[in-house]
Structure formats: C-alpha cells, structure tokens
Amino acid sequence: MASPTLTPGEPTVVYTDGACLGNPGPGGWAWAVPGDAYASGAEARTTNQRMEVHAALEAVLSIDGPVEIVSDSTYVVNCFRDRWWEKWEANGWLGAGKKPVTNRDLWERLIAETRRHDVVWHKVRGHSGDVMNERVDALARAAIATLSPRG
C-alpha cells in the first residue's frame, strides 16, 4: 500500500467498498484514493454490510487529517448523514424493532474514529461508471480471491 499524498487543510477523498460472495460468505473490503494509495482485505465468512463498514473504518484509520468518504453503501452513508448512530447509542445499541444493531463492534470503532477526524460522507451510485467506485469494487473482489479455498 502506498501512502496517499495529502494537501494540508484539504480533505483526502477516499473511496470505499465491500463485497461478498454469498451473504454470508467470503467477503472483501477496500479503500482507495485517486492515484496509487489503497488497501484491501478479506474475511472467510462475513456479510456485504460488514465489509462496507470495515472498508470505511480502515480508510479512516489509515488517513491523517480531514477525510471525505465516498461510498456506494446506503447503510454506511446514511448512518452518519441521518445520525442513526446517535439513536443507537441512546437506545443501548438497539435499532429498529428493538433488535441489537448488527455489526456493533465495527460501528463503535468507526464512530470513535469519526469523532477524532473531520469526516464528510458522500453517496455514489454503485456500478454507475464512476471510475474510483469501480476500482474499489474490483479491489474488494480481488481481496476475496486471495482467500484459500476450503478443501
């Protein structure tokens, strides 16, 4: 992974994506900035939403300074745009229907990191021809391919 070039005072634009073969199934996550900086990873059994949150978390952990996250995940973007997380915390991490919030472990870490960073969230339509969104989708899928098949 190369380090992104940062412009002081300007947010670093980071694209994130998660992918899953089956749901649950093997999954991958990725983040990338325009240029060469990116990171990706995979888990043997996970969900697409978990990988989307994981991608955003890894991006925020990896970039110093203000960050602009661009994601095709309504789940991730709306959590911050609509401040779902505030309701989750106030309700003891219970969501709709008084059910426990899924992926709480990742959400808690991501929320903590966004409190330490200046993060802006943007939604991009998936598979719409956005070059960077297509790039992180390909990186997330390539990460899945690195998993050893079960014998």
What kind of region is each of these model predictions?
Residues 1-50, 54, 58-66, 141-148:
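RNase H-like nuclease fold core
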Residues 44-47, 98-103, 151:
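Short C-terminal domain-edge/linker segments immediately following a structured domain
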Residues 80, 149-151:
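Extended, charge-rich low-complexity interaction segments
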